[in-house]
């Protein structure tokens, strides 16, 4: 079973979301998603300053197996991207919840968080796959 940290929120598309002290949210893909994709070779990051809507594809993770869109779990403005992934995309594999984060977003509608899954619900989703 994949590691599913209890403090995070999850999308059905296997993104995770963590609220930061400054009120922004850090987004990445789950351990389960990176296991399915395999070794990362490139991550196409979104533009800082871009405005996205929940469900928009805003980044792409390319692995040895496939390219997979990464979706915005909430609407808002992209305020930072993980530039370390340009040289070290494998961080998504080795540290999916720490060094392998993909972007940070300032949510424009925090009520959208209610549609995300908690760890228990995400684990149940994984069991059904």
UniProtKB/Swiss-Prot annotation:
Protein name: Glycine cleavage system H protein
Keyword Cell membrane: no
Pfam family, one: GCV_H
One GO process term, biological-process aspect: glycine decarboxylation via glycine cleavage system
Residues in Lipoyl-binding domain copies: 24-106
Annotated cofactor note: Binds 1 lipoyl cofactor covalently.
Matches recorded under InterPro entries: 2-oxoA_DH_lipoyl-BS, Biotin_lipoyl, GCV_H, GCV_H/Fam206, GCV_H_sub, Single_hybrid_motif
Required co-factors: (R)-lipoate
N6-lipoyllysine modification, residue list: 65
UniProt cross-references to HAMAP family, sorted A to Z: GcvH (MF_00272)
Keywords: Lipoyl
The protein's assembly and partners: The glycine cleavage system is composed of four proteins: P, T, L and H.
Superkingdom assignment: Bacteria
PROSITE patterns with a match to the protein in the record: BIOTINYL_LIPOYL, LIPOYL
């Amino acid at each position: 079973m994949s590691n599913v940290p209890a403090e995070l929120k999850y999308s059905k598309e296997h993104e995770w979301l963590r609220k930061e002290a400054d009120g922004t949210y850090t987004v990445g893909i789950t351990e389960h998603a990176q296991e399915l994709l395999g070794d990362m070779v490139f991550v196409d990051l979104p533009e800082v300053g871009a405005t996205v809507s929940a469900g928009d594809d805003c980044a792409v993770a390319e692995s040895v197996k496939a390219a997979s869109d990464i979706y915005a779990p909430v609407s808002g403005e992209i305020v930072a991207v993980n530039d370390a992934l340009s040289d070290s995309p494998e961080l998504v594999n080795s540290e999916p919840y720490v060094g392998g984060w993909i972007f940070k977003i300032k949510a424009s509608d925090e009520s959208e968080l209610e549609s995300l899954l908690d760890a228990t619900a995400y684990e149940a989703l994984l069991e059904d796959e």
